[in-house]
Amino acid sequence: TTSLNQTIYMRMLIDLKGAGETATTTLYGIFSNKAVVISNIPISIATAVSSAIIPGISAAYARRDETGARRQVGNAIRITSIIAIPSAVGLAVLARPITMLMFPQMESLELASSLLSLLAVTVIFYSISTITNAALQSIGRMNLPLISAGIALVVQTVVLVALLRFTDLDVRALVLVSILYSVMIFAVNQYYLRRFLGIRQDVRRDYLQPLVCAALMGAAAKAVYYLVSMAAEPMRNLPKGFYFRNIVATAAALLAAVLVYGYTMVRSGTIRRKDLLSMPKGQLLVRLMEKLHW
């Protein structure tokens, strides 16, 4: 969708609305080279961690063990949501600090971080859709992910043209259709999994509970960032002090986020020992949890 959306965006703003080519290209560059690049990082991590579970799906389905295949798919989706949901919340609440950390150009910081905070939600849907695509392919339904993508592409293209033609959303229209595209692929894939594999997910356990824990995590991370930034205020007087202060505050906020999310997930029973063991380095995570007496 990237090249198609870029073409539509550039042509409609320049040819139809008379926007300057330099300004339009700059705005698109901030979106694609900053906000999208950052949002893709947790998607890659979530996919890498969860894809370790996928080979078992093919093996179970080859043995005609549909119950085992359903269990494997459900576990993969659950682990992905456990990783993707806090990643999305973290990007949303720490969008400005993270953008400053990776792309410290002050002239584009506000726009890039605001786009990232909106785009963060796609982390959840793209991460899970990557797993469901692989699951559908594992059960021999190779064409279904293409159908999902095709349906989503048509709808998001129509919506993008309408938004650019009839609103002044400008580059934010690209964010909105990116969200729409990710949600549609997620929804259509979920339908296919229910139809062809009989999967019924526990929405409360797989999505709502991690979301509540992630919300608490986000509040803690935001508070820690603010407090550490205030404490490190004297660093502003140093050369590039604002940047180093941001590094310190962001690192503290991320550490707080990991601790709060891990603690609330374990204490609430949202994540279980067997969930941790199904992840790469799961034994290490279990030992760490035991040492912390969680």
Predicted stretch roles:
Residues N33, T80, L116-L119, V123, ...:
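Residue-level recognition of transmembrane alpha-helices
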Residues Y225-W294:
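Membrane-proximal transmembrane or re-entrant/amphipathic helices at the cytosolic face
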Residues Q6, I179-M230, L259-D275:
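C-terminal transmembrane helix end/exit motif
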Residues T132-V161, R172, I179:
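Alpha-helical transmembrane segments of multi-pass membrane transporters/permeases
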Residues G74, A92-V123, R236-G241:
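Interfacial segments at transmembrane-helix termini and the short loops linking adjacent helices
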Residues Q72-M102, D170-F196, L211:
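Short alpha-helical transmembrane segments in multi-pass integral membrane proteins
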Residues I43-R63:
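Helix-loop junctions and terminal segments of transmembrane helices
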Residues A23-A46, R78-I82:
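Alpha-helical transmembrane segments of polytopic membrane transporters and translocases
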